[in-house]
């Protein structure tokens, strides 16, 4: 199964009054100065493939100069199918559509997944744990509707339980029902996270070794529930996590009431990168950290293809300027030639003549 993004059109969106972009099945390079709207087009592609944006905009922020309605349309083609994805934003509200029929964000996910790589991602290793959890969950939500449901349900449970904990009249007896709900959702989410991270970890290890020969990198999951049991049966693991989370919630109840926040569960877990057995967050050089992130993105591409049976749409937003020549070349080699890719740049000098010959280059604004 192979799907491609064929045609993107926007109206009253961000910096554009109107714009249409025909995409190559291989590489499309959007070249132009800063503020030409290149990143806005990357965001539009991400919105209609993942149902979300790395900018987390309000509906009003999508509308060009406040004059709506904002409309974004993306045509997907492949295997004899044509699918039209859409998004509209007006009066502070936004809605998605699929073949003209209104749908939720989930309705545009999973058809053609997308993998975004932008400069903000380069700090993923050294930033807080929430950044790495979000990277894993955002990717998982594209691959599985069940994953998306679990992440959403668990997030609501945490928010509502935290609201209860902040009340001055909250006591242990009131937490029982909430503890059961959050433990059920949390244990199921944990199992899904571990399965996805296990898929990603092997590709991260391989890709890192190919870029930085002689060094070994790994990525592991550290749970607030303690050491995870080495079991292959997912139901057995979920049962263990449920019981352990109930016990941990009870153990920390007094402190949680005092602090007004839930202290254990997947929302507090850590995803740890290591290089040569040492914490990458603490000891890795900037170059090593960037190679880890590069390897993570290569892994996302590989896992998306494995799980969904179609190569994802790769979105590279001005990231080439942040990588040195060796890492730029290594990244593009690891991705391969059969991945539909959209790249933004202010400088075509970052690319080889061979890539420029194969790519469709779209000039936006002044020639660069």
Label for each model-derived stretch:
Residues 38:
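Conserved lysine of the Walker
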Residues 123-124, 130-176, 180, 188:
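Long, charged N-terminal accessory/stalk domains
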Residues 46-131, 135-147, 201-206, 241, ...:
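Nucleotide-state sensing region of NTPase/ATPase domains
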Residues 1-33, 47, 174-184, 188-313, ...:
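Conserved NTPase motor "head" modules and their coupling/switch loops across ABC/AAA+ ATPases, GTPases
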Residues 115, 342, 360-362:
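Hydrophobic/aromatic beta-strand patches that form the interior of the parallel beta-sheet core
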Residues 317-319:
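Walker B catalytic acidic pair
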Residues 100, 365-367:
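Glycine-centered positions in the ABC transporter ATPase nucleotide-binding domain
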């Amino acid at each position: 199964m192979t799907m491609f993004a064929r045609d993107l059109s926007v109206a009253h969106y961000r910096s554009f009054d109107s714009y249409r972009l025909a995409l190559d099945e291989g590489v499309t390079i959007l070249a132009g100065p800063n503020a030409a709207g290149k990143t806005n087009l990357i965001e539009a592609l991400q919105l209609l493939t993942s149902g979300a944006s790395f900018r987390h905009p309000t509906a009003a922020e999508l509308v060009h100069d406040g004059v709506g309605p904002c409309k974004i349309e993306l045509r997907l083609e492949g295997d004899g199918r044509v699918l039209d994805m859409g998004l509209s934003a007006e009066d502070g509200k936004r809605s998605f559509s699929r073949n003209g029929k209104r749908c939720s964000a989930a309705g545009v996910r999973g058809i053609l997944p997308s993998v975004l790589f932008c400069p903000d991602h380069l700090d993923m290793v050294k930033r807080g744990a929430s950044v790495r959890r979000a990277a894993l969950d955002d990717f998982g939500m594209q691959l599985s509707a069940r994953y998306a449901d679990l992440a959403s349900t668990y997030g609501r449970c945490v928010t509502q339980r935290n609201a209860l904990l902040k009340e001055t009249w909250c006591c242990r007896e009131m937490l029982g029902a909430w503890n059961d709900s959050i433990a059920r959702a949390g244990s199921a989410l944990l199992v899904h996270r571990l399965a996805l991270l296990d898929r990603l970890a092997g590709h991260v290890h391989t890709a890192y070794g190919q870029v930085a020969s002689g060094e070994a990198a790994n990525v592991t999951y550290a749970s607030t529930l303690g050491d995870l049991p080495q079991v292959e049966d997912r139901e057995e693991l979920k049962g263990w996590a449920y019981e352990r989370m109930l016990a941990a919630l009870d153990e920390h109840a007094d402190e949680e009431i005092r602090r007004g926040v839930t202290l254990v569960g997947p929302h507090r877990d850590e995803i740890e990168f290591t290089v040569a057995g040492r914490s990458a967050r603490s000891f890795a050089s900037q170059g090593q950290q960037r190679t880890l992130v590069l390897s993570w993105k290569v892994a996302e591409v590989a896992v998306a293809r494995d799980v969904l049976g179609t190569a994802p749409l790769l979105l590279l937003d001005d990231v080439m300027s942040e990588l040195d020549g060796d890492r730029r070349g290594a990244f593009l080699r690891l991705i391969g030639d059969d991945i539909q890719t959209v790249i933004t740049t202010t400088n075509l000098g970052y690319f080889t003549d061979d890539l420029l010959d194969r790519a469709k280059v779209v000039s936006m604004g002044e020639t660069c």
